[in-house]
Regions:
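Membrane-proximal alpha-helical signals and transmembrane carboxylates
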Residues: 6, 12-13, 17-408
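Bacterial N-terminal signal peptides that target proteins for export
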Residues: 1-5
C-alpha cells in the first residue's frame, strides 16, 4: 500500500511539472497583424508585438509602432503561416497569437478575397474568436506604422478601446468568428470597420462654413476634418459578399445599417430641426431589437420596424407641436435613408450583411431545405422595406431643470 501511495505521489508530481512548458520570456505576444499583397511573395505580413515592460501606465505608449522603441516587423512569404515561421527564425522566440486584438487587411487584399485567410485562422485556432477584423484603405503596413496612441494608454489598450467604440455591445459582425460563420453560410454578408490615415488639415477660416448636418455628411476613414498627432482613424465600414470586399460605406450608412441589424448602441447627432430652423443635438439609441416580419413566396417579403429613442440635449425642450414634427422628421429621414441602403445592398453589393438570412433560416425544417431555397439569389429581388419609429424622451429632467432656474 505504501509503495502504491509513493508511486502515485511520484506520478502526480511528474505530471504536474512544467518541464515542457515555455516561459513568458520565450514568447512574443502578437497584438496586431496587418496583411498586404506581397511583391516578392504572395503575402506581406506586418506583426505588431506587445512590449511587456511598456504594457501599462504612463509609459505604455513607448510600445507604439510610431516610436523608436516600436516592436514591429514585416516579412514576405508564400503564406501567412510561412511568414510566422520566418519570423520565428528572425526573433528566436515562439509567437503567441492568442492575445491578438485586431487583424487588418489592406483594401486591395480584401477586394481580391480574404476567405482563405479566415478559414485558415479558424482552422488553426491560434486566434481568439473575438479578434476584430478590419480593412485599411491604405496598406495595412503603413497604417500600423502610423498609429500613435495617447501617452496614457498602451497600444494593446488603444486597439481594445477604439474597436469597442466603433463596434457594438451586442453580437459583433466584425469578430473573426462571426465573419467565419457568415462565410461558411454562403447566404449572408459581413460588415467590418474601415481604417485609414488622415492627411487632412483643418480648413482656413476664410473657407466658409459647411451648412450640412450629420444627416448630410457620410465620411469614411481618412476623411474626417480634424487635427491631431495620431493621424489614424476608424470610420465607416467595409461591406463583404462572401470573402470579397464589394464596397466601402460611410459613417452614417454604417450607423443606419447597424440600427437595422439591431447592433446600434447610441450616438450623438446634430441635425437641422425643420420646425425650429436651427441645428438640434440629440442622442439616438436603440430602444429595442428591430421587429422583423417575413413572408416567403416567389418574391420574399420582409418588413422591418426599428424603434429608436432620441434624447433631446439642447438647452430648452421644444413645444409639443415642435416635438411631434421633429419625431416625424427623424422617422421619415431615417426610413428613407434605410430603404436606400437596403436597396443598394440588394442591387449593387449583392450582400445581405443585415442578417435577414438568419431570420428566414428559422422558417425551414432543416439545412438542406434552406440551402435549396437559394437566398443568395432571392435576396437580390426580395421586397424589403424598413420603417423607423423615433420617440423623443427624457424631457422630465429638462423641464424640472428649467423650473429650478425659474425659482432661483
Amino acid at each position: 500500500m505504501k509503495k502504491s501511495a509513493a508511486l502515485l505521489t511520484a506520478l502526480v508530481l511528474t505530471l504536474s511539472g512544467c518541464g515542457y512548458a515555455e516561459e513568458v520570456n520565450e514568447k512574443k505576444f502578437l497584438i496586431a497583424l496587418g496583411i498586404d499583397e506581397g511583391t516578392e511573395y504572395n503575402v506581406r505580413a506586418t506583426f505588431v508585438f506587445a512590449n511587456p515592460s511598456d504594457s501599462g501606465g504612463e509609459e505604455g505608449a513607448k510600445g507604439s509602432p510610431g516610436s523608436d522603441k516600436s516592436d514591429i516587423l514585416t516579412v514576405e512569404a508564400p503564406g501567412i503561416f510561412s511568414a510566422v515561421k520566418q519570423l520565428n527564425r528572425i526573433i528566436g522566440k515562439t509567437i503567441d497569437m492568442t492575445h491578438t486584438k485586431v487583424i487588418i487587411f489592406s483594401g486591395k487584399t480584401a477586394k481580391e478575397g480574404i476567405g482563405d485567410y479566415i478559414y485558415s485562422f479558424a482552422a488553426a485556432r491560434d486566434f481568439r474568436p473575438n479578434t476584430y477584423v478590419c480593412v485599411s484603405r491604405c496598406s495595412a503596413e503603413k497604417y500600423l506604422h502610423k498609429i500613435k496612441p495617447s501617452n496614457e494608454i498602451s497600444l494593446e489598450k488603444y486597439f481594445d478601446l477604439i474597436m469597442k467604440k466603433v463596434s457594438s455591445d451586442r453580437i459583433d459582425e466584425s469578430y473573426l468568428y462571426y465573419f467565419y460563420f457568415n462565410l461558411a453560410d454562403k447566404t449572408g454578408g459581413s460588415i467590418v470597420p474601415l481604417v485609414d490615415i488622415n492627411a487632412n488639415k483643418l480648413p482656413d477660416s476664410s473657407a466658409g462654413k459647411n451648412a450640412a448636418d450629420d444627416f448630410g455628411i457620410n465620411p469614411k476613414a481618412g476623411e474626417l476634418v480634424r487635427k491631431a498627432e495620431n493621424k489614424t482613424e476608424v470610420c465607416g465600414s467595409a461591406v463583404f459578399s462572401g470573402g470579397k470586399m464589394v464596397a466601402e460605406i460611410g459613417a452614417l450608412s454604417s450607423d443606419i445599417s447597424k440600427m437595422i441589424m439591431g447592433e446600434f448602441s447610441s450616438e450623438y447627432f446634430t441635425l437641422r430641426n425643420p420646425s425650429a430652423q436651427k441645428l438640434t443635438s440629440v442622442l439616438l439609441s436603440q430602444r429595442s431589437a428591430p421587429r422583423i416580419k417575413t413572408e416567403i413566396g416567389d418574391i420574399t417579403k420582409i418588413r422591418v420596424t426599428v424603434p429608436l429613442n432620441a434624447k433631446y440635449v439642447d438647452s430648452a425642450p421644444p413645444s409639443d407641436a415642435e416635438l411631434a414634427e421633429f419625431e416625424n422628421y427623424l422617422s421619415s429621414v431615417l426610413s428613407k435613408k434605410g430603404n436606400r441602403i437596403i436597396k443598394r445592398a440588394q442591387t449593387k453589393y449583392e450582400s445581405d450583411y443585415f442578417g435577414f438570412n438568419e431570420k428566414l433560416r428559422s422558417s425551414f425544417i432543416d439545412i438542406p431545405a434552406w440551402n435549396s431555397f437559394g437566398w443568395d439569389e432571392k435576396f437580390k429581388t426580395a421586397d424589403i422595406k424598413v420603417k423607423f419609429i423615433v420617440q423623443v424622451t427624457d424631457f422630465e429632467e429638462l423641464n424640472s431643470g428649467e423650473a429650478m432656474k425659474g425659482e432661483n
